Regions:
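Short boundary motifs at domain starts and secondary-structure transition points
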Residues: 170, 216-223, 309-314
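Long beta-strand-rich cores associated with HINT superfamily self-processing modules
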Residues: 123-125
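A short, compositionally biased
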Residues: 17, 134-136, 252-254
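Alpha-solenoid helical-repeat scaffolds
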Residues: 144-145, 153-155, 166-170, 186, ...
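Small-residue helix/turn framework positions
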Residues: 1-2, 6-8, 15, 20-86, ...
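Long, domain-scale non-catalytic interaction/scaffolding regions in large secretory-pathway
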Residues: 129-205, 277
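Intrinsically disordered, low-complexity segments enriched in small/polar residues
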Residues: 202-218, 296-310, 467-471
Length: 534
């Protein structure tokens, strides 16, 4: 839209001829005058001016899709341009040099920019009228600095497609936006929050008293992101580092088809963007979940250590329906896993969790929740492990050569404050029951905690190391076999109590009662040995 237009226009037989035009254009001034060197070439003009991005955003706010609007809203300042415009009956050509020094960008890395920092660009646009159909099509290219390339087109049917290349060649989808990216650092969480914002809406109180997390319908954004190819040396997703990540994603019928590969992640999944909570569904050949990241990326992509690692809001975690062939959690390697969750605001219900390997099958369910303010995370789990080879199960959880053989059943009902990956052991509560048989202790100082290492409670029963040679002789030594190992434990505020933990050996029965402080790893126990006399 042009305002306050001044100048001279000569109406000639073919096209209007502009001699000197000035106007207000998106909050800035624009000037159009005939090129002084174009006496023999009609329709060539010098074009210069400036655009205020606030006015530009206001104009297009209701004319573009939600994702394009999110991108525009992250820009501020103004853009200067200078170049030429060529007009003919069938063709419009624009060639501009861009002054982007006064442009500011709050987009995540690598597209952030401070106002006042030097940046230039070039923009070329061409529009062609087809005489036979009277339809017009357009195409354009742009170069922003040394790293960003753009290509776009608008066909005669009004379908727009645009490719963006960041340190890579642009990739053009059939419609919408395609991004091809190579970067040293990329925070996927920041980009996802920008392009897929969640809003909280409340339905009729008579229908539902709790707030419902809803989405802005971005999967129907026809001019939004449709293709993403990325190769990132240091990627952050779910506040975790994923090195050397290659990602290929395409939006098909509103569903993202994603193929990912990294030393910590490989497989194919669907990411379904939907009202309420998104869904991640598919199969991974491997998933190694690292510890949460303690670094953020500052200006220029330089890593900066933050005092407290950023946590992922529970309501931003999608529902999961995954099959994982090889699951690792930090240094632990439990095996294959199946997980299915169902989300409601402030709560993730773990409907089905199955961890399978040659040594055991563990099945479970549970809940991960926060309060109405999104704080005070809490977990409860109901687990049952059918142990086929206790020694190999313990080896999976990081303590090889502690026990040989052993089979049976371990059940646990546990709860604590904090997320599942960072429990507050001072709040640990619940019950554990152990019923195992036919095993052999290879390390008497390894701790019976290793017996239930499958639950990551290595310190829970550390008292049962039975390294008590001084008073009990050689009743229990390295290589001692046990016929039965059983007991029940009640846990409250991180303190586990038992009255009936015992081990049946060929030569004796060992009975233990007392308590263990899990966070402090201290114990107060009474151990009684009943020798077997032939």
């Amino acid at each position: 839209p042009f305002y306050k237009v001044h100048g001279t226009v000569r109406l000639i037989e073919e096209l209007p001829q502009f001699e000197q035009i000035s106007a207000e254009f998106f909050g800035g001034a624009v000037s159009l005058k005939q090129n002084v060197g174009s006496q023999n070439k009609k329709g060539l003009y010098d074009l210069s001016g400036k655009v205020d991005l606030t006015r530009l955003k206001n104009h297009f706010s209701d004319k573009v899709g939600a994702q394009s609007r999110q991108l525009l809203n992250a820009l501020n300042g103004n853009i200067g341009f200078k170049g030429n415009l060529a007009l003919s009956n069938n063709l419009t050509d624009v060639n501009l040099n861009l002054d982007l020094n006064a442009l500011g960008s709050n987009l995540p890395q690598p597209l952030d920019k401070k106002r006042g920092s030097n940046l230039t660009g070039q923009f070329k646009y061409q529009s062609v009228l087809n005489d036979s159909t009277s339809n017009r099509s357009s195409q354009w290219t742009a170069q922003i600095g040394k790293n960003i390339s753009l290509q776009g087109r608008l066909n005669a049917q009004g379908i727009m497609s645009q490719g963006i290349g960041i340190d890579a060649s642009p990739v053009m989808p059939d419609s919408g936006i395609g991004i091809n990216l190579q970067a040293n650092d990329l925070n996927v969480d920041d980009w996802h929050s920008l392009l897929y914002p969640k809003i909280v809406a409340t339905k009729n109180p008579a229908q539902r008293s709790a707030p419902e997390v809803s989405q802005t319908g971005l999967s129907r954004d026809v001019d939004g992101l449709n293709v993403l190819n990325a190769s990132v040396r240091n990627a952050v997703a779910l506040n975790r580092q994923w090195p050397n990540l290659t990602l290929n994603a395409k939006l098909v019928n509103g569903i993202w088809q994603i193929q990912a590969k990294s030393p910590r992640l490989e497989g194919q999944v669907q990411y379904i963007d939907r009202p309420g909570f998104d869904l991640v569904k598919g199969k991974l050949s491997r998933l190694n979940i690292p510890e949460s990241s303690s670094k953020v990326f500052g200006a220029g992509g330089k890593p900066e250590t933050q005092a407290t690692p950023k946590t992922v809001p529970l309501n931003s975690i999608p529902e999961l329906d995954l099959v994982i062939d090889q699951l690792s959690i930090n240094q632990y390697k439990p095996g294959a896993a199946v997980i299915k969750t169902l989300n409601i605001p402030n709560k993730i219900s773990i409907q089905n969790l199955v961890i399978t390997n040659a040594e055991a099958i563990t099945k479970g369910s549970g809940e991960w929740s926060v309060d109405a303010q999104g704080s005070n995370e809490a977990i409860w789990l109901d687990l049952k492990a059918e142990i086929k080879d206790l020694g190999r199960v313990i080896a999976h959880w990081g303590s090889p050569k502690a026990v040989e053989g052993g089979k049976g059943l371990v059940t646990a009902k546990l709860d604590w404050s904090g997320p599942p990956y960072d429990p507050d052991l001072d709040t640990l509560g619940g019950k554990i029951a152990i019923a195992l048989e036919n095993g052999r202790l290879l390390q008497v100082d390894s701790g019976i905690a290793k017996v239930i290492g499958v639950f990551s409670l290595q310190s829970l029963l550390k008292f049962a190391s039975f390294d008590i040679q001084g008073s009990l002789g050689n009743v229990i030594t390295t290589g001692t076999s046990f016929n039965k190992l059983s007991g029940d434990f009640v846990i409250r505020n991180g303190v586990a109590r038992t009255q009936n933990f015992g081990m049946q050996l060929n030569q004796a029965r060992v009975a233990t009662s007392g308590l263990v402080n899990v966070p402090k790893q201290t114990q107060d126990l009474r151990i009684t040995i009943f020798p077997t006399i032939d």
